[in-house]
Design a protein with these regions (language model features):
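N-terminal localization/anchoring segments of enzymes in phospholipid and broader phosphate metabolism
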Residues: 1-354, 358, 362, 402, ...
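Glycine- and other small-residue-rich loops at beta-strand/loop junctions that grip anionic moieties
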Residues: 184, 372-373, 407
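A short, conserved beta-strand element enriched in hydrophobic/aromatic residues
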Residues: 290, 370-371
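Helical hairpin unit composed of two closely spaced alpha helices linked by a short loop
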Residues: 363, 373-395, 399, 404
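Short glycine/threonine-rich loop-to-helix capping motif typified by GTGT followed
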Residues: 382, 408-412
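Active-site donor-binding acidic/aromatic loop of nucleotide-activated sugar
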Residues: 425-429
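Catalytic-core elements of nucleic-acid end-processing and repair enzymes
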Residues: 436
Length: 516
């Protein structure tokens, strides 16, 4: 087996060539569509009429969709201003989850997996919720999203991803039956190699090991031999939605989930991927800040079923489920209520956004949020502003050093309206904050993969964990308390009236921000 350095040298050119091939292939096909449309326009006014009719019909179709209004308006404006370009881009990339084969497979698999959630949902036990508000928030996730709440579970919060990785490796070492790992990005470098060696050692002892990664998320980090390399070490590995040089409307929907499950008894999730910068082994954007949680107990069942959602949807045969849901004896130390949940772009339920909205609307004292990207719907903006205007201490932490400069400009374009309503905005001065966490009133918290942006809330496959009634909620709050002193508060800077040119540019950015 090649060492890590050699693997890394191969990964970069290999990935660049794959991206270039895919990009050139897609670009040529898009240009061909434009050329064909323009040539047809030259020969017949009937084509122009057809284009106008199609523009009108597609616009009506978009307007009638049960999706966020800002998302609809951005597409409608683009199509009306540039009909051929707008129609082409929308038909290729704007229809979330439009591929019928994947929609059917995912839907069938999800329906099958719901049967394993059903017994927990039907029990409706009197779980130890701190108050009526948290009970209602859990009820939404159970009744509308189909994910049950669990007790008899301990939650450990990690504000330091190095600690999270060490805990994860310890859990992997203890595996006796199976290991499931699903990540948006895996980098074949030192952090992953430490994990891979443990996986290979466990596989050699008869443990079933599955690794699932998103092809776009990992394309700059691993080479095309990665799957074969893992197979040679006894590890099952699959890519989600592989990049191909052919137009594919599903290519815009990525697997952004981060899950590890060991034997159905221990699970991990959070914002961090298995790449070097997440553990500050490299520093492309200054200090990297992320977070995660460890679950032990009954709620790991929910995390296991979430992993099987996409793993099962990428195969034709129905996945085996029962043997991955063992009845593991466990007695929790705390009376927590824990609810792992997921979101996907193939239905009309904006689960991730609704959980955040519920927490913000119900907050009485404070709600604190971290997100790497801040691209908000009108409803989310109104909810944040209303909470702040009603006396709730609303604070949002975003990066101080961006990984994407255009998206950072879009993020900042939302500051002014929020700051003027009393929302306090902080930028993480040491570098890039990638954590996706929210805590409200010291009673409930969410840690997971879901950013406050349109891609996370509407286009990607995501997961998170909501929990209450345990010390981990206070740990999340303490993490915020440690963050604020190292952040730069920019509230007043953006609350003050700025120049007309700056305000105009912000409007342009926000107009098309849902498409970014």
């Amino acid at each position: 087996m090649k060492n890590t350095t050699e693997e890394k040298r191969e990964a970069i050119p290999n990935s660049v060539s794959r991206m270039l091939l895919a990009g050139i292939g897609v670009l040529l096909q898009v240009l061909w569509i434009f050329w064909l449309a323009l040539k047809l326009n030259d020969y017949s006014t009937a084509i122009q009429v057809c284009t106008s009719v199609l523009t009108f019909l597609i616009t009506l179709r978009i307007y009638g969709l049960h999706i966020n209004s800002a998302y609809k308006i951005s597409w409608i404006i683009l199509i009306l201003l540039f009909p051929i370009f707008g129609l082409t881009i929308y038909l290729l990339f704007g229809r979330s989850g439009a591929v019928s084969v994947m929609r059917r497979r995912f839907g069938e698999n999800l329906t099958m997996l719901r049967r394993y959630h059903a017994p927990i949902l039907q029990q409706r036990r009197a779980l130890p919720y701190p108050d009526r508000i948290t009970r209602n928030h859990a009820r939404y996730l159970q009744d509308c999203a189909g994910y049950p709440a669990y007790d008899n579970t301990d939650v450990t919060f990690y504000g330091d991803t190095c600690e999270a990785l060490e805990a994860q490796k310890t859990a992997l070492h203890s595996a006796e039956k199976f290991i499931f790992m699903e990540y948006h990005a895996i980098e074949d470098a030192s952090a992953w190699q430490e994990v891979e060696d443990i996986l290979a050692e466990r596989a050699a002892h008869g443990v079933e090991v599955r690794v699932f990664y998103d092809d776009v998320g990992s394309i700059g980090f691993i080479n095309s031999k990665f799957v074969k390399k893992l197979a040679g070490r006894g590890i099952q590995c699959r890519r989600f939605n592989p990049v191909i040089p052919i137009l594919n409307v599903f290519m815009n929907n990525r697997d952004h989930r981060k899950i590890t499950v060991v034997d159905g008894r221990v699970g991990f999730t959070g914002g961090y991927n298995l790449a070097e910068e997440y553990f500050n082994r490299t520093h492309p954007y200054g200090q990297w800040k992320d977070s995660g949680i460890r679950l032990e107990g009954d709620a790991v069942r929910g995390l296991t079923l979430i992993f099987l959602e996409l793993w099962g949807a990428t195969q034709k045969a129905a996945p085996e489920v029962e043997r991955y849901l063992p009845d593991v004896p466990y007695t929790a130390r705390e009376n927590a209520v824990v609810l792992p949940y997921a979101d996907n772009p193939l239905d009309d339920e904006a689960t991730g956004e609704n959980v955040y909205l519920n927490m913000i609307r119900s907050a009485k004292d404070y709600v604190y949020i971290t997100t790497p990207y801040l691209i908000l719907s009108d409803e989310m903006q109104r909810t944040l502003r209303l909470a702040a205007s009603s006396g709730v201490d609303v604070r949002i932490i975003t990066p101080g050093i961006p990984d994407k400069k255009l998206i950072f400009s879009v993020t900042r374009s939302y500051y002014a309206s929020l700051a003027k309503s009393g929302v306090r905005i902080y930028e993480y001065a040491p570098g890039f904050i990638h954590a996706k966490q929210c805590v409200a009133d010291g009673t409930e918290a969410v840690v997971g993969t879901i950013n406050f942006d349109f891609r996370s809330l509407y286009l990607h496959f995501e997961n998170a964990c909501w929990f209450c009634g345990c010390s981990a909620v206070a740990d999340v709050r303490r993490d915020f308390d440690a963050l604020f002193p190292v952040c730069r508060e920019v509230t007043q800077e953006y609350a003050d009236t700025r120049s007309l040119a700056v305000r105009g540019w912000d409007c342009v950015l926000r107009l098309f921000s849902p498409l970014m």
